[in-house]
């Protein structure tokens, strides 16, 4: 599964180094400030039975798109690459001085040999 974690980070410049904040995350609520354009064929879990989707997503109870998990639903062979998940990401908020936007991607997987043991 994959989760996108959008953050603003203080730049690695002299002023931020002097203030001892270079590289640190800016404390900011990102809800409603990030737009994702998903690849073709990425569908909501509820409609996954209707298509031949490789990626499905499951919304969180909060409804915040930044809390959404994406699942690749096919096993990959060693060296094989999954279908594309994300085409584009846009940050729509204000950037505080000496900061930049980062999209951190958290990914987890299981070995194909473990599939028989999944419940």
What do these predicted ranges mean?
Residues 1-119:
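Surface-exposed, hydrophilic segments of mature proteins
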